[in-house]
Amino acid sequence: MYILGLGIGALVVTFIIAVIVWTIVYIEYKKLVRQKKIDRLIERIGERAEDSGNESDGDTEELSKLMEMGHLNLGYVADL
């Protein structure tokens, strides 16, 4: 009887560890997807700024929403 209880306890601990690990993996995946979206928007804004300079306003607003910053001034971004 003692061995059965120990086995069930080990199974519960294993399940809890698996849930924690998969939660961390999911959070990191969401961060990665969000960063890729931000990188694509920055690249698109840079390309449009080279072409005309006026067509990237919608992308700038979307980028500022993703970065949770209010108004984003691209003049201060050094790596574009």
UniProtKB/Swiss-Prot annotation:
* Residue intervals passing through the bilayer: 7-27
Location, primary (coarse class): host cell
Q: Which UniProt keywords apply?
A: AIDS, Apoptosis, Host membrane, Host-virus interaction, Inhibition of host innate immune response by virus, Inhibition of host tetherin by virus, Ion channel, Ion transport, Membrane, Phosphoprotein, Transmembrane, Transmembrane helix, Transport, Viral immunoevasion
Q: Which InterPro entries match?
A: Vpu, Vpu_cyt_dom_sf
Record topological domains on the Extracellular side: 1-6
Q: Where in the cell is it found?
A: Host membrane
An example GO CC term for this entry is: membrane
Q: Keyword Cytoplasm: yes or no?
A: no
> Posttranslational modification, per the record?
Phosphorylated by host CK2. This phosphorylation is necessary for interaction with human BTRC and degradation of CD4.
Q: Which residues lie on this side of the membrane: Cytoplasmic?
A: 28-80
Q: What is known about regulation of its activity?
A: Ion channel activity is inhibited by hexamethylene amiloride in vitro.
How does this polypeptide assemble, per the annotation? Answer: Homopentamer. Interacts with host CD4 and BRTC; these interactions induce proteasomal degradation of CD4. Interacts with host BST2; this interaction leads to the degradation of host BST2. Interacts with host FBXW11. Interacts with host AP1M1; this interaction plays a role in the mistrafficking and subsequent degradation of host BST2. Interacts with host RANBP2; this interaction allows Vpu to down-regulate host BLM sumoylation.
Which miscellaneous remark does the UniProt record hold? HIV-1 lineages are divided in three main groups, M (for Major), O (for Outlier), and N (for New, or Non-M, Non-O). The vast majority of strains found worldwide belong to the group M. Group O seems to be endemic to and largely confined to Cameroon and neighboring countries in West Central Africa, where these viruses represent a small minority of HIV-1 strains. The group N is represented by a limited number of isolates from Cameroonian persons. The group M is further subdivided in 9 clades or subtypes (A to D, F to H, J and K).
Q: What is stated about domains?
A: The N-terminus and transmembrane domains are required for self-oligomerization and proper virion budding, whereas the cytoplasmic domain is required for CD4 degradation. The cytoplasmic domain is composed of 2 amphipathic alpha helix that form a U-shape.
Full protein name: Protein Vpu
What is the primary gene name for this protein?
vpu
